[in-house]
Regions:
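Edge beta-strands of jelly-roll/beta-sandwich modules across compartments, strongly enriched
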Residues: 184-195
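Short, surface-exposed beta-strand/strand-loop-strand elements in extracellular ectodomains
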Residues: 136-150
Length: 202
């Protein structure tokens, strides 16, 4: 890119005679340099959804599809089931109306005015799974009344498709409760996926 110091250097290198020809050459050179400055393309904006450290192409493809509406439950009993590799749009409830299967594990409790809800999940094969969300709420995966510690998480400001991905090592053929808390809107887009082999611990 040509800057102002380049223009000054160009002016110094050209002959500065008082003749009309010298002045004309100087004007032509400066005009060409200024045109080059104006024509220099601006840097392209970076898509925040493309800046995840891990490979999230599969989750992004799911979030580009049509979400299935589903009402989350206010308690674990009778909570609807979600299936891996499907996209859901959950309808959440006021936090005060929800009874959790286990106390949310976050350090600071969600505000009473936030949104919350529960669904169930069961996977056929044990391994590392991802829970992808379109907002920065808190998620717990509960098995037999105990929260499963997350293995990793990642989020990107400015990206909602997905905004946040949390990874958990899940047991096979075990009823699990996914509980959400601290939502800022009453709807939550959600997908559960199997983590790529490269992401799984060796």
């Amino acid at each position: 890119m040509i800057g102002s110091h380049d223009l000054r250097g160009l002016r110094e290198r050209l002959p500065m005679s008082g003749s009309a020809g010298g002045r004309w050459l100087l004007l032509l050179a400066l005009s060409a340099a200024a045109t080059a400055v104006l024509a220099d393309p601006a840097p392209e904006a970076v898509d925040p959804c493309a800046t995840f450290n891990s490979d999230v192409r599969h989750e992004r493809a799911l979030f580009a599809g049509q979400a299935q509406p589903l009402a989350a439950a206010k308690a674990a009993a009778g909570a609807p089931a979600v299936t891996p590799e499907h996209l859901y749009q959950l309808q959440l409830h006021q936090r005060a109306e929800v009874t959790f299967a286990a106390p949310p594990a976050q350090r600071h409790p969600p505000p009473a005015a936030g949104y919350a809800g529960l669904v169930t999940l069961e996977v056929n094969a044990a391994g590392l799974y991802r829970v992808a969300l379109n907002q920065a709420l808190w998620i717990d995966v509960v098995a037999k009344g105990v929260s499963i510690q997350s293995s990793d998480f990642e989020g990107r400001r400015g990206c909602a498709a997905p905004h946040k991905i949390v990874e958990f090592m899940l047991p096979a053929n075990t009823p699990l409760t996914l509980q959400f808390s601290g939502g800022i809107t009453p709807t939550l887009t959600l997908a559960v996926t199997r983590a790529p082999a490269a992401a799984a611990p060796h």
